[in-house]
Amino acid sequence: MDALELLINRRSASRLAEPAPTGEQLQNILRAGMRAPDHKSMQPWHFFVIEGEGRERFSAVLEQGAIAAGSDDKAIDKARNAPFRAPLIITVVAKCEENHKVPRWEQEMSAGCAVMAMQMAAVAQGFGGIWRSGALTESPVVREAFGCREQDKIVGFLYLGTPQLKASTSINVPDPTPFVTYF
């Protein structure tokens, strides 16, 4: 797939099933994440690969996070079932360090760029994905499960697998004009 076509036609796939990326495919995805823009080569991220029985553990963590937040039964059930939306999930944590030249927000953005790079690498290999976040990224229970320190941030959960719905061949690519000013 042509890189420009991939970027211009990017879209999320919310219904994902087996097979998930494995072996070299998964390594390609992780390597793409490692090449995200990164001021001062700080590599301010950590990737947690969740698959197989790890999804059961992740389910328990999300359920406990929802309970601790005082969520209603419907939200708790949704949290518990979230890891089963896809056969593979990569949780990305921005591991931020104090640096007077690279502020925390920039390190968080680098980790976010890593998520997009990994999603694009998955799509380039024939898989689909969706980047999810939400209130549980801030949950003390979930943060603890991923070893987050006070300065760290869970930037999202990247769900990956084989798309179950065929994407529309006609994509309405927005006109960038209203969003651009030539200065």
Curated annotation (Swiss-Prot):
Binding site for NAD(+): 121-126
Enzyme Commission no: 1.-.-.-
Cofactor: FMN
Keywords attached to this entry: Flavoprotein, FMN, NAD, NADP, Oxidoreductase
GO cellular component entries: cytosol
Keyword Flavoprotein in annotation: yes
InterPro entries (UniProt xref): NAD(P)H_nitroreductase, Nitroreductase, Nitroreductase-like, YdjA-like
Keyword Transcription regulation assigned: no
One example GO MF annotation: oxidoreductase activity
PANTHER family found in the cross-reference section: NAD(P)H NITROREDUCTASE YDJA-RELATED
Family indicated by similarity: Belongs to the nitroreductase family.
Protein name according to UniProt: Putative NAD(P)H nitroreductase YdjA
